[in-house]
UniProtKB/Swiss-Prot annotation:
<feature type="compositionally biased region" description="Basic and acidic residues">
    <location>
        <begin position="340"/>
        <end position="351"/>
    </location>
</feature>
<comment type="similarity">
    <text>Belongs to the TBATA family.</text>
</comment>
<feature type="region of interest" description="Disordered">
    <location>
        <begin position="167"/>
        <end position="186"/>
    </location>
</feature>
<keyword id="KW-0744">Spermatogenesis</keyword>
<feature type="region of interest" description="Disordered">
    <location>
        <begin position="292"/>
        <end position="351"/>
    </location>
</feature>
<feature type="region of interest" description="Disordered">
    <location>
        <begin position="195"/>
        <end position="216"/>
    </location>
</feature>
<dbReference type="InterPro" id="IPR037394">
    <property type="entry name" value="TBATA-like"/>
</dbReference>
<feature type="compositionally biased region" description="Basic and acidic residues">
    <location>
        <begin position="167"/>
        <end position="181"/>
    </location>
</feature>
<dbReference type="Pfam" id="PF15256">
    <property type="entry name" value="SPATIAL"/>
</dbReference>
<keyword id="KW-0217">Developmental protein</keyword>
<feature type="compositionally biased region" description="Basic and acidic residues">
    <location>
        <begin position="292"/>
        <end position="302"/>
    </location>
</feature>
<dbReference type="GO" id="GO:0030154">
    <property type="term" value="P:cell differentiation"/>
</dbReference>
<keyword id="KW-0963">Cytoplasm</keyword>
<protein>
    <recommendedName>
        <fullName>Protein TBATA</fullName>
    </recommendedName>
</protein>
<keyword id="KW-0221">Differentiation</keyword>
<dbReference type="GO" id="GO:0036064">
    <property type="term" value="C:ciliary basal body"/>
</dbReference>
<dbReference type="GO" id="GO:0007283">
    <property type="term" value="P:spermatogenesis"/>
</dbReference>
Amino acid sequence: MATDVQLADYPLMSPKAELKLEKKSGRKPRSPRDSGPQKELVIPGIVDFERIRRALRTPKPQTPGTYCFGRLSHHSFFSRHHPHPQHVTHIQDLTGKPVCVVRDFPAPLPESTVFSGCQMGIPTISVPIGDPQSNRNPQLSSEAWKKELKELASRVAFLTKEDELKKKEKEQKEEPLREQGAKYSAETGRLIPASTRAVGRRRSHQGQQSQSSSRHEGVQAFLLQDQELLVLELLCRILETDLLSAIQFWLLYAPPKEKDLALGLLQTAVAQLLPQPLVSIPTEKLLSQLPEVHEPPQEKQEPPCSQSPKKTKISPFTKSEKPEYIGEAQVLQMHSSQNTEKKTSKPRAES
């Protein structure tokens, strides 16, 4: 009985079964998936961005069944023999032969690597950075380009004033020197010293200059009232454009050398537009132009006089036609035959 109990407690087993039990009881080998580093515990409330980036960069293992039909393989054979027109193109050289050009741009990042602003907790911008529309139509601040235009107009006006001052200085230098010595005036019967005469001339000259300058200043103020608009219009002609945006862009971003060239052109244009003094045409020139107007009718009358000068000569009076002097007046008596003809013609006309 004791032996039966012992057998029931310890049943008989074959050697194969024992080996299987040993295998089962042993530690299982790790699979390739389990070979990676074990996940660490994550404390709530703390975000480790480096760990997220590593997880996103590591490619997930894909089984062959996940590939869709028509997807290109990344095998070296297919990548080598498949055409890539976006990377390799041919352009023509000067002789017309095709030349291979490689556009080696970095590969675009997958969508999974792009972090959204909501995930990172960063405030997002609605307008994309590097918007092509912003490059085509740049938003120029109105105050900036207006300030540049005002500065350019002030420089043009300053240069024109400098030129006028230089001209006046030259005119003053060209004036004749003071006459030395005193002169006798027949009106007063006294000697006038040279200093007083020079002062009188200066005052008269200054009075004329002040009158002319006041006239010119009034005209210039009227013309330069819209000075900025005038400069803007001249810039349109210089740059050969009608677009206000192009002129605004030029005012803000043009190099200084180009602005200096444009300033010289603006200066010459404004100097031509300014009015000339009223005394610019001398009186001699006007007098010389007056006979030229009356010359054509005189030329028409001259040819008959030149052709028959003898006909115009006065024939000598006959004895019967000699005038009689009554005081200072000359009286010429006509023939009696002529008087009778006149008398007969009068009653005929009356009838």
